[in-house]
């Protein structure tokens, strides 16, 4: 590696709104604020919900049920 051309890595803290603190290596050099992380994201915690506005999923299933039968 050539000296003097590579960015310096620093250990920074990524703070999540849930209170989780993650230490990572970064070239940014400043701390990060996260809205979601692996500890509070609905997909990873198993609390994922399907939001159906106006019965759109039911309408879709009715429309394409004919094609599924073929």
Swiss-Prot record:
<keyword id="KW-0699">rRNA-binding</keyword>
<dbReference type="InterPro" id="IPR042105">
    <property type="entry name" value="Ribosomal_bL31_sf"/>
</dbReference>
<protein>
    <recommendedName>
        <fullName>Large ribosomal subunit protein bL31</fullName>
    </recommendedName>
</protein>
<dbReference type="GO" id="GO:0006412">
    <property type="term" value="P:translation"/>
</dbReference>
<keyword id="KW-0689">Ribosomal protein</keyword>
<dbReference type="GO" id="GO:0019843">
    <property type="term" value="F:rRNA binding"/>
</dbReference>
<dbReference type="GO" id="GO:0046872">
    <property type="term" value="F:metal ion binding"/>
</dbReference>
<keyword id="KW-0862">Zinc</keyword>
<feature type="binding site">
    <location>
        <position position="37"/>
    </location>
    <ligand>
        <name>Zn(2+)</name>
    </ligand>
</feature>
<feature type="binding site">
    <location>
        <position position="40"/>
    </location>
    <ligand>
        <name>Zn(2+)</name>
    </ligand>
</feature>
<keyword id="KW-0479">Metal-binding</keyword>
<dbReference type="InterPro" id="IPR034704">
    <property type="entry name" value="Ribosomal_bL28/bL31-like_sf"/>
</dbReference>
<dbReference type="Pfam" id="PF01197">
    <property type="entry name" value="Ribosomal_L31"/>
</dbReference>
<dbReference type="GO" id="GO:0003735">
    <property type="term" value="F:structural constituent of ribosome"/>
</dbReference>
<feature type="binding site">
    <location>
        <position position="18"/>
    </location>
    <ligand>
        <name>Zn(2+)</name>
    </ligand>
</feature>
<feature type="binding site">
    <location>
        <position position="16"/>
    </location>
    <ligand>
        <name>Zn(2+)</name>
    </ligand>
</feature>
<dbReference type="GO" id="GO:1990904">
    <property type="term" value="C:ribonucleoprotein complex"/>
</dbReference>
<keyword id="KW-0687">Ribonucleoprotein</keyword>
<keyword id="KW-0694">RNA-binding</keyword>
<comment type="function">
    <text>Binds the 23S rRNA.</text>
</comment>
<dbReference type="InterPro" id="IPR027491">
    <property type="entry name" value="Ribosomal_bL31_A"/>
</dbReference>
<dbReference type="InterPro" id="IPR002150">
    <property type="entry name" value="Ribosomal_bL31"/>
</dbReference>
<comment type="similarity">
    <text>Belongs to the bacterial ribosomal protein bL31 family. Type A subfamily.</text>
</comment>
<dbReference type="GO" id="GO:0005840">
    <property type="term" value="C:ribosome"/>
</dbReference>
<comment type="subunit">
    <text>Part of the 50S ribosomal subunit.</text>
</comment>
């Amino acid at each position: 590696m050539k000296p003097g051309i590579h960015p310096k890595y620093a250990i920074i803290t990524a703070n999540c709104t849930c209170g989780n603190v993650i230490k990572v290596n970064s070239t940014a050099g400043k701390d990060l604020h996260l809205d979601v992380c692996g500890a509070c994201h609905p997909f990873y915690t198993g609390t994922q919900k399907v939001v159906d506005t106006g019965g759109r999923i039911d309408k879709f299933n009715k429309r394409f049920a004919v094609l599924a039968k073929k």
